[in-house]
Curated annotation (Swiss-Prot):
Keywords: Magnesium, Membrane, Transferase, Transmembrane, Transmembrane helix. Signal peptide: none annotated. It is a multi-pass membrane protein. The chain crosses the membrane at residues 45-65, 69-89, 114-134, 135-155, 163-183, 188-208, 231-253, 257-276, 296-316. This is Polyprenyl transferase prhE. It comes from Penicillium brasilianum.
């Protein structure tokens, strides 16, 4: 069992700026791991930009910005709550995996009750933001929260827990609802855009999970990285190409033009192709996976949103 003596306090980064007593809680919320926050918040940014680009009426920029802030805060709260909840449920598994055995709960720096209270608080903060959004958003939010609570149990009962993470793709219909547009008005484009987001999330998580695949197999933790260890590359590329195609379909069906095709689809393709080429085949313990994911995802999303914003401006 890991002990506090095995743990080295952070000497740099955001955690080093916190009071010593607050560091374990910052670690529990993963505030030092921006990739997870990016993956939870960026779909809402894409959702707002996509809705603005396809809306039959011109949506005021101030209205769009206001909704973007609320949805981004929602994504931040749900990501934080999900991390605390996941670590609480996974505490027994985390103790047995080298990469996770020194997390706050396994090493005893945070009590289970403390983690539960923190998770409940962050879920509550997220829930309070729904008061600022149309009532329809509560339905999409409930789906997101349900699957966030379910996720840590997935690796115990299924070889495909990554599929639970597709709940993040509900950011697209939730963003549309927040802007007073029903996702059912454009069901196929909405589904295509949501599938594109879901494909990216699952792709990145599978590649990231390869770091722990061997140890997960030994301790009985199940995942797609463990189940399909021999064909991880093929699955990742399959998700990449299907996600790119879905993005293309989602734009074409709503009449988006060359700015979308060149910047949004092109940026998605180049950004995530860069990620896969840099991350796959580097070995299960590759230190490049997270850094490549951060830079590649940022590049892909910036170009995707730029293309959608270009389409919005053209329609003004």
């Amino acid at each position: 069992m890991p002990t506090k003596g095995d743990y080295q306090p952070p000497k740099d980064g955001i955690l080093s700026k916190l009071p010593e007593s607050a560091v374990p809680y910052g670690e529990l919320l993963r505030i030092h791991r921006p990739l997870g926050y990016y993956l939870n918040i960026s779909p809402y940014v894409v959702g707002v930009a996509y809705t603005a680009a396809i809306s039959p009426v011109t949506l005021p920029s101030t209205f769009l910005l206001g909704r973007l802030v609320i949805l981004s805060l929602w994504g931040f709260c749900i990501r934080s709550a999900g991390c605390a909840w996941n670590d609480l449920i996974d505490m027994d598994i985390d103790r047995q995996v080298s990469r996770t055995k020194l997390r706050p709960l396994p090493r005893g720096a945070v009590s289970p009750s403390g983690a539960a209270l923190l998770a409940a608080f962050m879920f509550g903060c997220g829930g309070s933001l729904l008061l600022l959004l149309p009532s329809q958003c509560a339905f999409e939010a409930a789906i997101v929260v349900f699957f966030a609570l379910l996720y840590p149990f997935g690796k115990r009962f299924s070889d495909h827990p990554q599929l639970i993470l597709t709940n993040i793709a509900w950011a697209i219909p939730m963003a549309m609802s927040s802007l007073d547009m029903s996702p059912l008005d454009f069901p196929i484009p909405t589904l295509a855009m949501s599938f594109s987001i879901a494909s990216v999330i699952v792709m990145i998580d599978i590649v990231y999970a390869c770091q722990d695949a061997e140890e997960d197999k030994k301790v009985g933790a199940r995942s797609m990285a463990v189940r399909y260890m021999e064909i991880t590359d093929q699955i990742a590329y399959g998700l990449f190409f299907s996600g790119t195609l879905s993005l293309l379909v989602g734009g074409i069906l709503r009449g988006l033009g060359f700015p979308f095709l060149i910047f949004s689809v092109g940026g998605h393709f180049l950004g995530f192709l860069r990620f896969l080429r840099a991350s796959l085949g580097k070995g299960a313990k590759s230190a490049l996976v997270e850094s490549q994911a951060k830079s590649s995802c940022l590049l892909a999303t910036m170009l995707l949103v730029f293309g959608l914003c270009f389409e919005y401006c053209v329609r003004l």
